[in-house]
């Protein structure tokens, strides 16, 4: 009945009446996502009628009402077939300021029309294969990039920027050709990186270092939404970059990684928005060539070095807050390097473990990222080793028992999801420099058996990658417990593949020097 009344007014009424009836329809169906099939034909005709109104000279408020209803109706895939034509798509492109390259964005009164047109295009392109084909024919991706360039550094049009980015994300998600076009022809990587710089108000202090104001205000909701959409679009553009990239691209990837480091060190308007922002940053960092991730850590500034030199003992006993701050800062510094971003990633990983669900989607990206960073960058590995696998003092409880990060990761080594189990074990193995005896020390043989069997290391040894050598750091507690622990380690294999008998292992053990190959 609503569609029939609205259709009658749209066909015969004047602009004021059309605006009123469509506003009523929009208010009533704002949260409608499932539609009655009996009224399908009426909704198709209403869409056609709305497009006929949009080509006329009607007030801006009437255009907005038309577009709001069109956005609601475009949630129904079935009605889009007859209305998704090249002519109708061009109408929406014109209203979204995507039709002519020289259109300006000076008329603030037009902004609601632009935003609603972009929202309609997002729904229509996502739900209609015909619209997707027309998007390629009309070169929609190039038009969206052009609109983004007009929006650059214009904070008062964040809504336009946000839905432009969302439409770019949808297009690049659905078409691999558009990903390639965005990456190479349209220079999407630097363009989208600049959008992030603008959203975060980044001030560069060095080529790949930005100023971080830890006491500054959080991002606004609009800036956060823009940043999230830009991160998602960048993910699609760079999805294969970790496999193939030119040396000339390294600078741009390092700039992007530096922007993502800044992203990890700021917060959104709410805790949930901050987690969503950081989650998308983690996903994008996974696409960055690992050789370019060195910018996630940076040398301490002179001010930070001076602050680091001040010990806790030098602070007055009544300065509890200052002591807490100094202690916090000291845990984020390693070998003269600022490790704040890595510390944030580690905390993010632990929060995802504590959630206890959706490990494959929520946990594996950050675990994979930390694993690759640790494998490629020594300072990152050593810092994470200190945080995750500190010197072993608790030798009475099983490795999987407890609430430390190590305990949580060891429990994941026997998770039912094969992917989760493998990446958790791989992360710990890399932190142990791929040494079997070191891994067994921290995880126990039963927990590590799956990884060792897959790598053919049940008899001991080490992985294929090379790591630096350092001094022994076994604790006295571990050294005292180690003779007992040796009896639980694998007894070795004979040439025929059978396990060495216990008696033979005991006789061999009596002449083996007590050593430890765990070094950092």
Curated annotation (Swiss-Prot):
The consequence of inactivating this gene is: Death during early embryonic development. Conditional deletion in olfactory sensory neurons leads to death on the day after birth in the majority of the cases: surviving mice do not express GNAL (G(olf)-alpha) and are anosmic due to a strong reduction of mature olfactory sensory neurons, resulting in difficulty in suckling.
Q: Which residues carry this modification: Phosphothreonine?
A: 473
Molecular function terms, GO-annotated: G-protein alpha-subunit binding; guanyl-nucleotide exchange factor activity; protein folding chaperone
Q: What is the effect of changing residue 400 to A?
A: Reduced ability to fold GNAL
- Has the keyword Cell inner membrane been applied to this entry? no
> Per the record, what is one GO cellular component?
cell cortex
Q: Where in the cell is it found?
A: Cytoplasm, Cell cortex
The question of whether rRNA-binding is a record keyword is answered with no
| Listed result of changing residue 126 to A | Slightly reduced ability to fold GNAL
> In this chain, where does the modification Phosphoserine occur?
468
Main localization of the protein described in the UniProt heading: cytoplasm
Describe its function.
Answer: Chaperone that specifically binds and folds nascent G(s) G-alpha proteins (GNAS and GNAL) prior to G protein heterotrimer formation, promoting their association with the plasma membrane. Also acts as a guanine nucleotide exchange factor (GEF) for G(s) proteins by stimulating exchange of bound GDP for free GTP. Acts as an important component for odorant signal transduction by mediating GNAL (G(olf)-alpha) folding, thereby promoting-dependent cAMP accumulation in olfactory sensory neurons.
The protein's assembly and partners: Interacts with GDP-bound G(s) G-alpha proteins GNAL and GNAS. Does not interact with G-alpha proteins when they are in complex with subunits beta and gamma.
The record's annotation in PANTHER family points to: SYNEMBRYN, SYNEMBRYN-B
Q: What is this protein called?
A: Chaperone Ric-8B
């Amino acid at each position: 009945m609503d569609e029939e009344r609205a259709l009658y007014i749209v066909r015969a009424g004047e602009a004021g009446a059309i605006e009123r009836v469509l506003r009523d329809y929009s208010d009533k169906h704002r949260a409608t996502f499932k539609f009655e099939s009996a009224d399908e034909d009426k909704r198709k005709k209403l869409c056609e009628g709305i497009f006929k109104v949009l080509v006329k000279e009607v007030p801006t408020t009437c255009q907005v009402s038309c577009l709001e209803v069109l956005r609601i109706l475009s949630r129904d895939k079935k009605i889009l077939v007859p209305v998704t034509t090249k002519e109708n798509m061009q109408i929406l492109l014109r209203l979204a300021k995507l039709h002519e390259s020289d259109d300006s964005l000076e008329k603030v009164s037009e902004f609601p029309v632009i935003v609603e047109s972009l929202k309609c295009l997002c729904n229509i392109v996502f739900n209609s294969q015909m619209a997707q084909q027309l998007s390629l024919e009309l070169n929609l991706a190039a038009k969206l990039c052009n609109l983004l360039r007009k929006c650059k550094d214009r904070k008062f049009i964040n809504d336009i920027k946000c839905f432009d980015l969302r439409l770019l994300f949808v297009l690049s998600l659905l078409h691999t050709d558009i990903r390639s076009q965005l990456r190479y022809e349209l220079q999407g990587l630097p363009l989208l990186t600049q959008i992030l710089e603008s959203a975060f108000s980044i001030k560069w202090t060095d080529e790949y270092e930005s100023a971080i104001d830890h006491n500054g205000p959080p991002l606004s909701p609009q800036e956060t939404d823009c940043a999230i959409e830009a991160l998602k679009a960048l993910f699609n553009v760079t999805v294969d970059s970790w496999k193939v990239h030119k040396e000339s691209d390294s600078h741009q990837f390092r700039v992007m990684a530096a922007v993502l480091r800044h992203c990890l060190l700021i917060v959104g308007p709410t805790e949930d928005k901050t987690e969503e922002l950081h989650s998308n940053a983690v996903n994008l960092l996974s696409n960055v060539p690992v050789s370019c991730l060195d910018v996630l850590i940076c040398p301490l500034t002179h001010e930070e070095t001076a602050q680091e030199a001040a010990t806790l003992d030098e602070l007055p006993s009544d300065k509890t807050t200052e002591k807490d701050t100094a202690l916090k800062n000291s845990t984020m510094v390693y070998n003269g390097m600022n490790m704040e971003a890595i510390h944030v990633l580690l905390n993010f990983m632990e929060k995802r473990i504590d959630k206890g669900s959706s490990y494959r989607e929520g946990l594996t990206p950050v675990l994979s990222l930390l694993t690759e960073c640790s494998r490629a960058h020594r300072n990152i590995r050593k810092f994470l080793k200190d945080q995750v696998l500190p010197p072993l003092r608790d030798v009475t409880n099983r490795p999987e028992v407890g609430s430390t990060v190590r305990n949580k990761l060891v429990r994941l080594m026997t998770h039912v999801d094969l992917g989760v189990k493998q990446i958790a074990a791989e992360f710990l193995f890399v932190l142990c420099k791929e040494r079997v005896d070191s891994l067994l020390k921290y995880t126990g043989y039963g927990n590590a058996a799956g990884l060792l069997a897959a790598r053919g290391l049940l008899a001991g040894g080490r992985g294929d990658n090379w790591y630096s050598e350092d001094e022994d750091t076994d604790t006295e507690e571990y050294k005292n417990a180690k003779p007992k622990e040796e009896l639980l380690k694998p007894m070795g294999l004979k040439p025929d593949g059978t396990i060495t008998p216990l008696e033979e292992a005991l006789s061999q053990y009596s002449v083996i020097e007590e050593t430890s190959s765990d070094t950092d």
